[in-house]
Structures are given as structure tokens and as C-alpha cells.
Amino acid sequence: MGARGSVLSGKKTDELEKVRLRPGGKKKYMLKHVVWAVNELDRFGLAESLLESKEGCQKILKVLAPLVPTGSENLKSLFNIVCVIFCLHAEEKVKDTEEAKKIAQRHLAADTEKMPATNKPTAPPSGGNYPVQQLAGNYVHLPLSPRTLNAWVKLVEEKKFGAEVVPGFQALSEGCTPYDINQMLNCVGEHQAAMQIIREIINEEAADWDQQHPSPGPMPAGQLRDPRGSDIAGTTSTVEEQIQWMYRAQNPVPVGNIYRRWIQLGLQKCVRMYNPTNILDIKQGPKEPFQSYVDRFYKSLRAEQTDPAVKNWMTQTLLIQNANPDCKLVLKGLGMNPTLEEMLTACQGIGGPGQKARLMAEALKEALTPAPIPFAAVQQKAGKRGTVTCWNCGKQGHTARQCRAPRRQGCWKCGKTGHIMSKCPERQAGFLGLGPWGKKPRNFPMTQVPQGVTPSAPPMNPAEGMTPRGATPSAPPADPAVEMLKSYMQMGRQQRESRERPYKEVTEDLLHLNSLFGEDQ
């Protein structure tokens, strides 16, 4: 083991090997555990010689104890081994690691209570960061630290007189005198236009102060005068006078807070100048997340110098009104006056890829879903199906294929044999005749006028065609359209027969065996 195993004597090593790792467990500590603990101490920058004494182990435990709740498994194992070694040096009889930890923690708590009051950390005195501090009953001015001035300059350079500059100035100038505030303003190198605006506001407020607080006249020698507007601005007063005005017993005048208020008015005017965006123009883009839109809205609202009631109305009305259509639809479903947390939660996924995919899926589902048929259309369609007429028996309610009557031979239209209904020569055709290759006519069909039908009533004019009673009426004159229709039908029939004749002749020749074998058959 070498020197690393020499932190414990032989007797203490024997006692170490009797301590169990866990309560009720079989495994016990061995010398290799001490060697591992020495290696871990090197990682923490602690000397291995600390394990040789009780005080050294106590110092190690003080370092490791604050790290145990959030430490790794190796750190907790090292803490357990040091607790066991501490108990061995303190001649405490322990059976397992848990007992050693309890004893070590009890000793650490007792040492903490015995610590003298001078060694305990004390909080800094209140008001230690303020430029004016009270020492030995007297108020003493301390200049601003370079860190405070640097923070103010960085705030102005980074935000460029944004809405954050006003609360930042309030925090950094807390408890300052007019002298300190002028020092902060003089540190701003750029943005001299804004500085000139602040100077004009200071001059206006100083003039108003002089009008509201006129001078009472000459004061007795040695008596402190009342501050004028220029005194509050720090141009005609010293630091000592400013401190006396702020902390005197009778009628104190907080010149520092008054001057800070004037500077805030100037900064607010600069914020409006450097941020000309009106809150009415803050609208959410079609693809902008709702959270980003809310951040821009409240940033612009922060720059608005209006009454809190007006800001509350803007928040409840304009925030929902200027949202995009998708978010507006969701926000209107939240009811009246929803909280900002509810609005952010409801609009969390709007505008993202998940919401777009959901909309596309809904649109695709609607496109693939068949449109429902109205009930009236279903009844009308069912009624039409019931008017089917059978060509075989002439009855309604079924088709010819479903007819149980004997199959009628020949054409179902004219009753003749030798052809079917689709090739019936008595089909109706228009005056243009049948189409090419036996297709349907290219015009609307015309009904044939049956011959021999005479009108049942005499003509209206008796002088033109009235026959005497008892005489046989003459046949009506032939209609030229009917004659033309008949001629076209005859020509169509002839053309169809001429087209079908070659096929019939070839078929008959093929079926006739004499044409193939001659007289052998």
C-alpha cells in the first residue's frame, strides 16, 4: 500500500475492517477504501495528511458537508469514509456507515454553536451603498462607485433610451444627491440631443418651482436658506448644503428625490422620441408566435406615459383586437377578461408546424369525407327506382332480367323476330338520320305522326273546309316533314343492311361445310 495506507495505525485499521458498509450488510470496509479516499482528496485539493487526525477529518467534513445534498455518488462515498475515519480517531464505537454519519454530524453541529460571534459573518449595514451615510452621528457624502457609473453608461448605450432606461435610472440613483445625479448625466458621452432635452425639462421644472416657492427675502447670517430651482439642480448649491436640506430636523426638503423626478420626466420624453412606435400599430404577424407579439405589445405599453386605467383598457382590448385571425379565434373562446397566463397557454402552439399539420389534416379529412345526401334527395331517388318497367311483361317494379314471366321472343319494341330492340328498324330518328356506323341519331328524336288519323272536330272556318253532314271526310294532305323523315329512315335502313350483308355472307360461307370440302360431305 505504501504511504497512502499509513493514515491509520494497525489497531485503527483492524477497527475499520469491522465497520459494515451498510446496516445489516455483509461487506465491510477494507484498506483499499482508504486508498481510494486519499485519491479523491487530491481531486478536491485537500491534503491526505488531514486523515491522520480527528481535527483534520473535521476540516474535511466542513468542506464536504455543504456539497453532499447536490453532490455526486463519489462525493457522498468520500463523505461516508471520512465520517468513519473521524469516528475511529474520536474513539467512537460504530457498527456501520449510518451510525458514523450521525455521530460526525452531531460533532459538526456542536462546533458550529461554539463558534465565537466575531467569526460569524455579518450583513453589511443598511444604506451602505447610498452616497450619504451616517458616521458617528454626522452625515458624510461618499462619491458614487465606478461600478454604478459604468452600469448606468452601459444601460444607456445598450438600450438607447428604451423603456428600460427609466426604471434603471430609478434603481441606480436611489438616495443620490443632485451632485451625484449630475455626475451620472455627465458620464453619457453620446446622445447629446437627449441630454439637451433633459436640460430643457430641468429648466422648465426649476422655473415652476421658483414660482410655487417664492423667496421669503434676505435670511439672517448663518441660517440655511430655502433651496431654489437652481439649487435643486445642483448648479448653485454645494454637496454640504444639499445634505443639510435633505436631512435637517425642521422642514427637510428632499432635493435629491425632486431632482430625480425632473430627470425622469426628461427621460420619459426621450423614450417617446427614440421609440415613435404607437401602441395602436403593434399587431401580430400572420406567422409570429403569440408570446413574441405580447412581448412587443407590453414593451410599447411600457413606453406609454398614460394613466394606469388607460393602460389596463389597452391591455384588455388592443391585445386581443390586434392579434392575428388564428389567435383571435382562440382568445375569443376564452370568455370575458381572460388572464395573460390563460391567453399564453391557449395560443402556445398556434402558428407552429404542429398547428399547420393539424389544419392540413382536417382539410384533407373534409375533402375525403363524402358529402351527406339530403333526405329529400334520397326519397326522390328511391321513388325513381320504383318506376322501373319490365320490357318482357310490360309491368313496373322490376327489370326484364328479374322477370318471372316466360321470355318473349323477338324484338321487345315491335314484336318481330330476327332482330333485337337495339337494332329495331322502327327506332325513332330525327331528320338527320342515324349517326355513322349505326350510332344514335345526332339530333333529338321526332315522333312519327300515325297515318289515317283525322281530326275529331271540323275546322274553325266553315267556308274553307267544312264538309256537309253525312259526307265522307277526305284524307288530310301529306306532311312534307313526315315524308322526309320516312325517306331518311328508309335510307338509313338500307345503309345498315348494306353494312351487315358482307358479314352475313362470310359467316354463312364459313358455316357451310360444302365450301370447305366440296362434295366429300
Swiss-Prot record:
Identify one Gene Ontology CC term for this UniProt entry. viral nucleocapsid
Lineage of the source organism? Viruses, Riboviria, Pararnavirae, Artverviricota, Revtraviricetes
GO MF annotation: an example: structural molecule activity
Q: Which stretches of sequence are listed as region Dimerization/Multimerization of capsid protein p24?
A: 274-360
Q: Which GO terms describe its biological process?
A: viral budding via host ESCRT complex; viral translational frameshifting
Q: Where is this motif: Nuclear export signal?
A: 16-22
Give the residue numbers of the N-myristoyl glycine lipid attachment.
G2
UniProt gene name: gag
Q: How is it modified after translation?
A: Gag-Pol polyprotein: Specific enzymatic cleavages by the viral protease yield mature proteins. Capsid protein p24 is phosphorylated possibly by host MAPK1; this phosphorylation is necessary for Pin1-mediated virion uncoating.
| Feature type site, description Cleavage | Y130, P131, M360, A361, A377, V378, G430, F431, F444, P445
- The segment annotated Interaction with membrane phosphatidylinositol 4,5-bisphosphate runs over 73-77
Q: Residue ranges of region Interaction with host CALM1?
A: 8-43
**Region span, Interaction with host PPIA/CYPA and NUP153:** 186-223
Q: Which Gene3D superfamilies match?
A: 1.10.1200.30, Human Immunodeficiency Virus Type 1 Capsid Protein, Immunodeficiency lentiviruses, gag gene matrix protein p17, Single helix bin, Zinc finger, CCHC-type
Using the UniProt annotation, give all residue ranges assigned to the region (Disordered): 105-129, 448-484
Q: Where is this region: PPIA/CYPA-binding loop?
A: 214-221
Record's compositionally biased regions (Basic and acidic residues): 105-114
Task: Tell me what this protein is called.
Answer: Gag polyprotein
Which residue stretches belong to region Interaction with membrane phosphatidylinositol 4,5-bisphosphate and RNA? Answer: 14-33
* Residue numbers covered by motif Nuclear localization signal: 26-32
Q: Which UniProt keywords apply?
A: AIDS, Capsid protein, Host cell membrane, Host cytoplasm, Host endosome, Host membrane, Host nucleus, Host-virus interaction, Lipoprotein, Membrane, Metal-binding, Myristate, Phosphoprotein, Repeat, RNA-binding, Viral budding, Viral budding via the host ESCRT complexes, Viral nucleoprotein, Viral release from host cell, Virion, Zinc, Zinc-finger
The UniProt entry annotates the motif PTAP/PSAP motif at 455-458
Q: Which Pfam families does the entry link to?
A: Gag_p17, Gag_p24, Gag_p24_C, zf-CCHC
Q: Which InterPro entries match?
A: Gag_p24_C, Lentvrl_matrix_N, Matrix_HIV/RSV_N, Primate_lentivir_Gag_pol-like, Retrov_capsid_C, Retrov_capsid_N, Retrovr_matrix, Znf_CCHC
